[in-house]
Amino acid sequence: MSIGKMLSPAAIGVAVAGLLAITPVRAQESIKIGLILPMTGGQASTGKQIDNAIKLYMQQNGDTVAGKKIEVILKDDGALPDNTKRLAQELIVNDKVSFIAGFGVTPAALAAAPLATQGKIPEIVMAAGTSIITERSPYIVRTSFTLAQSSTIIGEWAVKNGIKKVATLTSDYAPGNDALASFKEHFTAGGGEIVEEVKVPLANPDFAPFLQRMKDAKPDAMFVFVPAGQGGNFMKQYAERGLDKSGIKVIGPGDVMDDDLLNGMGDAALGAVTAHIYSAAHPSQINKDFVAAYKKAYGSRPGFMAVSGYDGIHLIYEALKKTGGKTDGDALIEAMKGMKWESPRGPISIDPETRDIVQNVYIRKVEKVDGELYNVEFQTFEAVKDSGKTKK
C-alpha cells in the first residue's frame, strides 16, 4: 500500500511540515574538536588541567557557536608521539574533526604537524613550549607559551639582582634545551657565570645524584627546568638533599612551581623565584573569577596549563564566530592571526606573523598567603614575544 493511500491529506501535510522542521537540524552539523592530551603517565596533570579548563569554558559559554554545536573528542596519547600521530590521523580521517588541539609535550605537537598541513586542519597547541613548533606547519597556532619567553626574562632578572653564579638542571629534551640556551645567553651576557650544567632524563628522573652535584658546586642559585608535573618530585628531593637549607635558591621558568602542585611541595619551595605567564594569585578580577569557578568545579586551583587550555578553546570559539561557523582551515587560521583578548593571565594576542602567543611574563616569588603557597607576582614584562623568533 502506498503512503498516499495510508494517510489523509491533512496527515500528509503534518508529516511534510515535520520533515521540513527536522531538515535544518540535520543540516546543522556539529563542529568536532579532537583534543589530544596526556591523561595518564608522568604528564597527566597537564592533560587534566587543560581538559578541566575546556569543560569549564564550555559550561560558562555554551556548546554552540555560530549556530553549530561544538563536540570535543578527548584522546589520551600518554605524551608518546607515536600515539599522538596515530590518534590525530584517526580523528582527522574517521571522526572528521575541524581542529586538533592540546599536545602536552613538544614531540607530540611535532608529530601531528604534518597531518595538520596535509589536512589543512588548525592545530591549537595548548601546552608544548619549544619555539620551533609553530614553524613546522602554517596551520599551527599556540596559546601556551615558549620556554624562551620566560627563560630569557629570568636570566636578565637574576644577573641584575645579585645572582652571579648559577648551576643549571634541565630536562634533556627540546624544551629543556630551549630554556637552557635562552637563560645562558642572557645571564652570561650580563656577567653571570654557569658553574655546573646538568641534564636529566625526561622519563621518570631520579634527581638525587644530580642534586648532589649542584650542592657541591656551591652556586648562588640553581636554574631549574622540568616539565609540568615533575616539579613536586624535584622539590621533594631538593629538600631531602638539604639544598633548601644550604642557601642555594631555586630560579627558573615557572613550570617547576606549577600552581597545580605547589601546595604539596611544602616550605622548601618558599622563596623560589620564577618567571612565567600565569599565577593563580594574579590580581585581576577576571582571574579571581576564573580561579573561583575552577576551584568550585574541581576542588583545586588552576595552573598555567589550565589557563592555556581555557584560552585555547576561547580562540577556537572566536575564530568560528569570525568565519560564521565555516570550518575552512585557511579561513580559520586567518581569523586567529592578530586576535587579542583579556585572559585570566593578562592581555594576550596571536602574533600574525608567527602564529605564536604574545603575553606578559611575570617575575614571581613563592610566598605563604592565608596558609597556602602561591607564586606572588612582583614584576611584569609586558607583551613578550618569543625571543627564539624575534632574532630571525
Can you describe what each PLM-predicted range is?
Residues P9-A21:
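Bacterial N-terminal signal peptides
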